[in-house]
Amino acid sequence: MLKILKESLKTAPIVKRGTYNYFIHPISDGVPVVKPELLRDVIACIVKNADLDVDKIVTIEAMGLPIGASLSQITDIPFIIIRKRKYELPGEIAVHQATGYSKGELYLNGICKGDRVLIVDDVISTGGTLAAVIKALEMAGAEIKDIVVVIQRGNGKKIIEDMGYNVQTLVTIDVDENGVQVLGCIDDECK
């Protein structure tokens, strides 16, 4: 499991954003192309490992969308998209998020008090986006049953764990000017 994801990460191009080595990958960026077999690889691993006894799947715009939509189709669990755009619907919750390379507002709609949710996202690096999502879900009165992120890079997972939540990550990577190194994965087949 995850062979396609691991191999695709090892060949991901690297670009500099200031001093930040940014990897470009179909799961995290949607370019150059998101191949169905890559998405199937990722979704199969999430289905195998996530707590799916939930009312809703929560994902974050933009690259959480293919993950959330695919997972929703497979599991028949509805999904909610946390957007970067305000809709001004009743009950909308706005939270500020900051990442390693951007900041802005996120908007949560469609969550009711008591909803049991699974959060899925593409990458965790600084933990800024996920921390903001958790804060919004807590404000809405949701019960966060599980958090699954495809790619872990950096110390963001520890930040979320310090908030009292476990984060399952499918693969852990390091990125430098030479490329992406896969350091570990949710199954023991990474070595």
From Swiss-Prot:
GO molecular function, a single term: hypoxanthine phosphoribosyltransferase activity
Main location: cytoplasm
Keyword Glycosyltransferase tagged: yes
HAMAP family associated with the record: Hypx_phosphoribosyltr
Gene Ontology terms: cellular component: cytoplasm
Stated name of the protein: Hypoxanthine/guanine phosphoribosyltransferase
Xref: Pfam families: Pribosyltran
Gene name as annotated: hpt
Keywords: Cytoplasm, Glycosyltransferase, Purine salvage, Transferase
Protein family (similarity comment): Belongs to the purine/pyrimidine phosphoribosyltransferase family. Archaeal HPRT subfamily.
Cytoplasm is among the record's keywords: yes
UniProt xrefs under SUPFAM superfamilies: PRTase-like (SSF53271)
CDD domains xref list: PRTases_typeI
Involved pathway(s): Purine metabolism; IMP biosynthesis via salvage pathway; IMP from hypoxanthine: step 1/1
Subcellular location: Cytoplasm
Protein function: Catalyzes a salvage reaction resulting in the formation of IMP that is energically less costly than de novo synthesis.
Quaternary structure, from the entry: Homodimer.
GO biological process: IMP salvage; purine ribonucleoside salvage
Catalysed reactions, semicolon-separated: IMP + diphosphate = hypoxanthine + 5-phospho-alpha-D-ribose 1-diphosphate; GMP + diphosphate = guanine + 5-phospho-alpha-D-ribose 1-diphosphate
Record-listed E.C. numbers: 2.4.2.8
Gene3D superfamilies: 3.40.50.2020
Organism from which the protein derives: Methanocella arvoryzae (strain DSM 22066 / NBRC 105507 / MRE50)
